Each structure stands twice: as structure tokens, then as C-alpha cells.
């Protein structure tokens, strides 16, 4: 996913993969991050929002656009572990708030999820990618 119209100074929201638990035991997600962030992109923060509140998955959205959810007015669930039931997908998903500080030369890639299951801590890295380029 990406945009060829990014400009220095803009802020974008990029959705990480929707948390899905394929195991038979519940999990609690305790943290998320983008692993490879190129020069030119600064991660301001990570938020966790309801699919219902954002009226679906806001895969990539420029802050301030008419169609972009008003994240500041929505409940951010990132302050607490996110519980995902066995064999289920979450109705809460994570987004990275990204600031363009200079035009990036490459994509931001790989999403890391920290979680607990049955008293043990795990980290899982999933493939995800956002490319923000401009002229």
C-alpha cells in the first residue's frame, strides 16, 4: 500500500495487519511496531482503534483529509493489552502515525507484534509495507 503524493510535513496513518489468533488459546497483544523505518519517516506513535469507530479498516489515510477518521476524537485502546479470543480476529486494529520529514528512499516494512499467551511472552513479525513517495 502507498501513495505517490506524499509531501514533507504531512502526517499519515498506516494500518498494521488486523490481529488474528489462529490458536486454541486466547492471546493478549502488549505492543506493536514497524521494524524497518527508512530515513524520511518518523513514527510519532501507535494507536489502536475499533473497526466500527473508523467505519472499516483505514489502511492508509492522510491526516486532515475529509475521508480520514478523526483519530483524536476516537477511543484509543493502545493503553491496555488487546485480548484476542481463540480462532478469532480482533475488532480493534493498530495504526502507526507517520510524519514525513523528508521524502523516503524506500518503504517502511515489517510489523512486529508482542503478545502473551498462557503466561509466556512472544514476538511475531508479519510482512507489511507502506511506501510514501512524492515529487
Show the residue positions of the predicted features.
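Non-catalytic macromolecular-recognition regions in eukaryotic signaling proteins
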Residues: 1-135
